[in-house]
């Protein structure tokens, strides 16, 4: 009986150790899952910020492109107006020079005045045209540089978004694996707990049955001894001896 009780206690301790191991593994898996979920939330926040920044930059690119197109059209229109103005001035000079009057001095003076006006107008127009051209070129260069930097930043954001998307997918995969591991640990823990409870119930039942069997054996032995005592008491010389032996045997069996 002592050996059987020791074996049952050993099996019970083993089952408890297995349960503790599953419990510890389950807690570790839950902690890993919480960490993965926090990382996923942080990565998703970075991706959202990157998408918003990309949208802003794309809007800026669109605005800059429209502004460059507008400046280009304005530049072409101003060139057309300047060319028309220069052409009109030349025509006026030709018309003035084409007059055939007898007053030579007046014609010469008027021609000189118109030549001076035409020269100054042409010089002013050319100067204004050159300044506008330089201003337009500087504006186009400036906006082109801004557009180039914006495109580079968009490309960098696209690469960042791709990297963050890959990290998010990796985090999702890890989270799925952790969820599967947690579910498996829960199933294994429940199975181990159920098995341990079954074994514990079996051990308790076996122990109870052993106690009942022992009690039955003791009663049967006592009945046998009592019947023997009753038979031997008929002989006075041997009655005391039988009583002593029966008490000693019962005491030893109970112990």
From Swiss-Prot:
<dbReference type="GO" id="GO:0045095">
    <property type="term" value="C:keratin filament"/>
</dbReference>
<comment type="subunit">
    <text>Heterotetramer of two type I and two type II keratins.</text>
</comment>
<keyword id="KW-0403">Intermediate filament</keyword>
<feature type="domain" description="IF rod">
    <location>
        <begin position="1"/>
        <end position="255"/>
    </location>
</feature>
<comment type="similarity">
    <text>Belongs to the intermediate filament family.</text>
</comment>
<dbReference type="InterPro" id="IPR039008">
    <property type="entry name" value="IF_rod_dom"/>
</dbReference>
<protein>
    <recommendedName>
        <fullName>Putative keratin-87 protein</fullName>
    </recommendedName>
</protein>
<keyword id="KW-0416">Keratin</keyword>
<dbReference type="Pfam" id="PF00038">
    <property type="entry name" value="Filament"/>
</dbReference>
<keyword id="KW-0175">Coiled coil</keyword>
<dbReference type="InterPro" id="IPR003054">
    <property type="entry name" value="Keratin_II"/>
</dbReference>
<feature type="coiled-coil region">
    <location>
        <begin position="147"/>
        <end position="227"/>
    </location>
</feature>
<dbReference type="GO" id="GO:0005829">
    <property type="term" value="C:cytosol"/>
</dbReference>
<dbReference type="GO" id="GO:0005615">
    <property type="term" value="C:extracellular space"/>
</dbReference>
<feature type="coiled-coil region">
    <location>
        <begin position="19"/>
        <end position="81"/>
    </location>
</feature>
